C-alpha cells in the first residue's frame, strides 16, 4: 500500500507514468538479485499494477548434484515445491526479499532513484524541446561571467554573451522575455540556449501583442534586425479591410510601444511588404 501511494505521488508530482516506475522497480529487483547471487539471467519479476505487490522467482534446473545453487536445485528440494518434479525439469523458486540483504535492497532503491532522475530529465527535455523557437518569460538567476542564467520555471536556460544585446544589463530576480534558441539533451538535463538578439524574438512578441498577427490575418513577411538599435519588419494583410501596418502599430502606437519597451528602446520600423 505504501509503495502504491508513493508511485501515485510520483506520477502526479514528477509527471512520470506509474508503468515506467513499475518497470524501474522490476529492473531494480533483477539487479539486486544479480548483485546478491552473481547472476540474474534466470530471474523473473511479476508486479501487480493495482496493488504493487510483487514476487521474485528464479528458474532453476533440477539436478542430481547441484554445482551452481543460483541456477540449479536438487531433486529433493524441487519435490518439496512440486511433488511431480523430475531431473532436468525447470522449477520456479520464489526468492524472498529478505534474502537479498541490506546492500541489495539499497541497490534496488538506487536503481529506482536513478530511473526517476532519468525520466525527470526526459520529461523536462521533451517539455522544453517543444518550446524551441518560442518566447518565454524568465527570471534572471545570476550573472556568470559574461553569461546569464535564467530560470524558466522547471529548468534554467543560458543567455550567452553573443546572444545578448550590447550594453543590456541584467539583475538577479529581474523578469525578462527570451527566445528559446535551442534545447540540447545532456546527461545532466536539458541545456537550454536563449537569445535576446534573434529576429524570432521580435516576431513572437508581435504575435503575442497583435491579435491580427496571431490569427494569421496579418503576416510578417520579413524581419531585418540590428539588435539593440533598429528592427525593420515588412507586413502583409490577407484581409483587404485590415491595414497591416496600422494593426501592428496599434491605437496611438500602444502595440508597437509595448514591444519597444520590452526591447529596451530598440526602434522598430513597420512597412508594407512589397514583392
Label the predicted regions.
Residues 1-275:
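RNA-contacting regions in translation and RNA-metabolism proteins
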Amino acid at each position: 500500500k505504501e509503495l502504491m501511494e508513493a508511485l501515485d505521488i510520483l506520477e502526479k508530482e514528477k509527471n512520470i507514468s506509474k508503468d515506467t516506475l513499475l518497470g524501474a522497480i522490476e529492473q531494480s529487483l533483477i539487479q539486486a538479485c544479480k548483485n546478491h547471487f552473481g547472476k540474474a539471467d534466470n530471474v523473473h519479476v511479476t508486479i501487480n499494477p493495482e496493488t504493487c505487490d510483487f514476487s521474485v522467482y528464479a528458474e532453476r534446473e533440477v539436478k542430481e548434484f547441484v554445482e551452481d545453487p543460483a541456477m540449479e536445485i536438487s531433486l529433493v528440494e524441487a519435490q518439496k515445491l512440486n511433488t511431480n518434479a523430475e531431473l532436468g525439469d525447470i522449477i520456479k523458486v520464489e526468492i524472498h526479499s529478505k534474502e537479498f540483504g541490506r546492500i541489495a535492497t539499497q541497490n534496488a532503491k538506487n536503481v529506482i532513484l536513478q530511473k526517476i532522475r532519468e525520466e525527470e530529465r526526459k520529461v523536462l527535455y521533451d517539455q522544453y524541446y517543444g518550446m524551441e523557437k518560442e518566447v518565454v518569460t524568465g527570471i534572471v538567476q545570476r550573472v556568470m561571467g559574461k553569461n546569464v542564467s535564467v530560470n524558466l520555471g522547471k529548468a534554467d536556460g543560458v543567455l550567452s554573451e553573443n546572444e545578448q544585446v550590447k550594453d543590456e544589463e541584467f539583475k538577479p530576480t529581474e523578469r525578462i522575455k527570451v527566445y528559446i534558441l535551442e534545447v540540447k539533451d545532456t546527461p545532466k538535463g536539458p541545456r537550454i540556449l536563449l537569445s535576446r538578439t534573434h529576429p524570432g524574438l521580435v516576431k513572437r512578441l508581435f504575435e503575442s501583442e497583435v491579435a491580427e498577427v496571431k490569427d494569421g490575418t496579418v503576416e510578417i513577411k520579413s524581419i531585418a534586425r540590428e539588435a539593440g538599435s533598429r528592427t525593420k519588419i515588412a507586413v502583409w494583410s490577407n484581409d483587404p479591410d485590415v491595414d497591416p501596418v496600422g494593426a501592428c502599430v496599434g491605437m496611438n502606437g500602444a502595440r508597437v510601444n509595448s514591444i519597444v519597451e520590452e526591447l529596451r528602446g530598440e526602434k522598430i520600423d513597420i512597412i508594407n511588404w512589397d514583392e
